[in-house]
């Protein structure tokens, strides 16, 4: 057995235990460490001992955010309505520890699926707010270590802007991982694709020097967004009048509607063009019957796809099989999320949402990937909040601070060019997003935008008629009528864009990050301090740091 590894993991666990309340909790940690030691012993022949030892230590640290809360706040875990005893809180924590240790044992049983950290199995990057959090920037950075990058939901309504080697790239359908010259990029079955826009995006990338040939694949099961869908999108928005949703008018909703009505056309249909033509004629007739003002021309649209079908079919494959074969072959797969959790058709602020599921479930339904193949789930959180279009926004600002955030943060939509609404970071919303997705790590982006503010605030609770709300209300009127409780913290004036370590940040900025981490109970691993791909601080987890140092 690698006793040095086990002893380091044990010492790290003991140091963490010393910070926790109650002898039972410390005893449980000792027992958990023993289980971890046995895991190391069992995996000796198949896996590096250090890897399992580190996993063990990290599992024990997984509840650090809960342990650091005060008694009353911690008692709220497990959905308790009233403060409960420390012993009950400890039991809730231990449930988390057991869950994480079971994952370690799964790693031992399936050593080909697990190593240190990310890059094993399927990792996922998801927006945790209302979009525009900076997902593309992290994907651009992480993708250099992955073999396959895949999108699983949404369409050209999504937009990523990335500054890469001094050039600004704008992505809508193509995964931003295409900037990794060694990666294969996939548009999964859950994406709806406007093929003319897709080809235009590829041509723009080619003009900027990106060689995508042979590296971009489209699912034969992906549904197509047609020009008539975009026209219908605009008509629907006009019909809503003052109840407009704020759609991007990219045809996303109508395309998903066709999918659910089972009269849509899929990319793979282009292989059998006579059938495709018949489906197109029927679809145009269906929409003209329901939208007399529609100007769609079936023959003209069929001609467009006849001209491009060969080029598209060269990129079209069964991506479900491709992804799962890549997984079995040990390829590193990264899912690049589009839109965000609060725009999810089921979990977002309905009806002011998108028409797909840009939360964790879309990885399975939009990529054909089994949930037991998922590894890291990374939530992207802007250091403040933004939203494009209509819909409730509890922490929205209409003052000089809101103007500062919009101006300094260059908050204009990549897809629409519309100015984004800005506000303070919303913890109740983030806790809800964290609950839905089960984030393993967070990336806090655009911390530099808060520079120059004398005071910064964090929305920590919603109140309605004198009562604190539990969770995120599904009723929009209740959400709109709620009052946000804020915590105020000191701001900072120092330029942080050149900071490379957490310790280099101003003390006030460090306190802000740590407070957000404490409130969410999830480790903030990455901190964005500027627009470039390298303007990111990577934080070592406290227990991982203790383990590596061996102190």
Curated annotation (Swiss-Prot):
Names of the cofactor(s): Mg(2+)
Domain of life where this protein originates: Eukaryota
InterPro entries: Adenylosuccin_syn_GTP-bd, Adenylosuccin_syn_Lys_AS, Adenylosuccinate_synth_dom1, Adenylosuccinate_synth_dom2, Adenylosuccinate_synth_dom3, Adenylosuccinate_synthetase, P-loop_NTPase
Sites where the protein binds IMP: 132-135, 157-160, 248, 262, 339, 354, 418
CDD domains, A to Z: AdSS
An annotated GO cellular component: cytoplasm
Active site (record annotation): 132 (proton acceptor), 160 (proton donor)
Binding site for Mg(2+): 132, 159
Gene3D superfamilies: Adenylosuccinate Synthetase, subunit A, domain 1, Adenylosuccinate Synthetase, subunit A, domain 2, Adenylosuccinate Synthetase, subunit A, domain 3
Disulfide pattern: none
Reaction(s) this enzyme catalyzes, per UniProt: IMP + L-aspartate + GTP = N(6)-(1,2-dicarboxyethyl)-AMP + GDP + phosphate + 2 H(+)
A molecular function (GO) term: magnesium ion binding
GO biological process, any: IMP metabolic process
EC number(s) given by UniProt: 6.3.4.4
Annotated cofactor note: Binds 1 Mg(2+) ion per subunit.
Binding site for GTP: 131-137, 159-161, 420, 446-448, 528-530
Subcellular location: Cytoplasm
PROSITE patterns: ADENYLOSUCCIN_SYN_1, ADENYLOSUCCIN_SYN_2
Pathway: Purine metabolism; AMP biosynthesis via de novo pathway; AMP from IMP: step 1/2
Binding residues for substrate: 414-420
Keywords noted in UniProt: Cytoplasm, GTP-binding, Ligase, Magnesium, Metal-binding, Nucleotide-binding, Purine biosynthesis
Subunit structure: Homodimer.
Similarity annotation: Belongs to the adenylosuccinate synthetase family.
Job description of the protein: Plays an important role in the de novo pathway and in the salvage pathway of purine nucleotide biosynthesis. Catalyzes the first committed step in the biosynthesis of AMP from IMP.
Protein name in the entry: Adenylosuccinate synthetase
Species for this entry: Phytophthora infestans (strain T30-4) (Potato late blight agent)
């Amino acid at each position: 057995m690698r006793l040095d590894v086990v002893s380091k993991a044990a010492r790290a666990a003991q140091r963490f235990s010393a910070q926790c309340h109650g002898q039972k909790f410390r005893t449980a940690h000792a027992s958990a460490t023993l289980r971890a030691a046995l895991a190391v012993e069992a995996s000796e022949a198949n896996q590096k001992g250090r890897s399992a030892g580190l996993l063990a230590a990290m599992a024990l640290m997984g509840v650090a955010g809960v342990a650091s809360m005060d008694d009353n706040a911690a008692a709220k875990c497990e959905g308790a309505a009233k403060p409960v005893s420390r012993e009950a809180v400890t039991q809730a924590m231990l449930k988390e520890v057991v869950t994480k240790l079971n994952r370690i044992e799964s790693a031992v049983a399936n050593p080909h699926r697990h190593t240190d950290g990310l890059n094993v199995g399927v990792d996922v990057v998801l927006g945790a707010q209302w979009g525009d959090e900076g997902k593309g920037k992290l994907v651009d950075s992480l993708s250099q270590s992955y073999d396959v990058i895949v999108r699983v939901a949404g369409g050209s309504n999504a937009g990523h802007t990335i500054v890469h080697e001094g050039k600004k790239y704008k992505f809508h359908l193509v995964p931003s991982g295409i900037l990794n010259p060694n990666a294969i990029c996939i548009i999964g079955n859950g994406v709806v694709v406007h093929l003319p826009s897709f080809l235009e995006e590829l041509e723009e990338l080619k003009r900027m020097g990106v060689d995508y040939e042979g590296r971009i694949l489209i699912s034969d099961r992906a549904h197509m967004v047609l020009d008539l869908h975009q026209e219908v999108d605009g008509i629907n928005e006009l019909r809503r009048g003052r109840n407009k949703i704020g759609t991007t008018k990219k045809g996303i909703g109508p395309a998903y509607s066709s999918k659910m009505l089972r009269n849509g056309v899929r990319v793979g249909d282009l292989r059998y063009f006579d059938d495709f033509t018949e489906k197109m004629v029927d679809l145009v007739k269906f929409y003209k019957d329901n939208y007399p003002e529609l100007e769609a021309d079936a023959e003209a649209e069929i001609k467009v796809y006849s001209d491009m079908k060969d080029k598209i079919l060269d990129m079209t494959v069964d991506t479900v099989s491709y992804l799962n074969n890549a997984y079995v072959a040990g390829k590193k797969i990264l899912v690049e999320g589009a839109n965000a959790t609060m725009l999810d058709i089921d979990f977002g602020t309905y009806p002011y949402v998108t028409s797909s599921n840009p939360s964790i479930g879309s990885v399975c339904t939009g990529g054909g990937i089994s949930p037991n193949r998922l590894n890291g789930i990374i939530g992207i959180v802007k250091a403040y909040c933004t939203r494009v279009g209509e819909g409730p926004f509890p922490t929205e600002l209409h003052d000089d601070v809101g103007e500062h955030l919009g101006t300094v943060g260059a908050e204009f939509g990549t897809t629409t060019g519309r100015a984004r609404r800005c506000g303070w970071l919303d913890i109740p919303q983030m806790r809800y997003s964290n609950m839905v997705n089960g984030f393993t790590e967070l990336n806090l982006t655009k911390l530099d935008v808060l520079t120059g503010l004398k005071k910064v605030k964090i929305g920590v609770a919603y109140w309605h008629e004198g009562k604190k709300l539990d969770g995120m209300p599904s009723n929009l009127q209740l959400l709109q009528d709620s009052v946000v409780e804020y915590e105020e913290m000191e701001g900072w004036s120092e330029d942080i864009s050149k900071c490379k370590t957490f310790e280099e940040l101003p003390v006030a900025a460090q306190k802000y990050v740590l407070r957000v981490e404490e409130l969410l109970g999830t480790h903030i691993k990455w901190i964005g301090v500027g627009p470039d791909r390298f303007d990111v601080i990577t934080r070592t987890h406290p227990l991982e740091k203790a383990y590596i140092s061996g102190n």
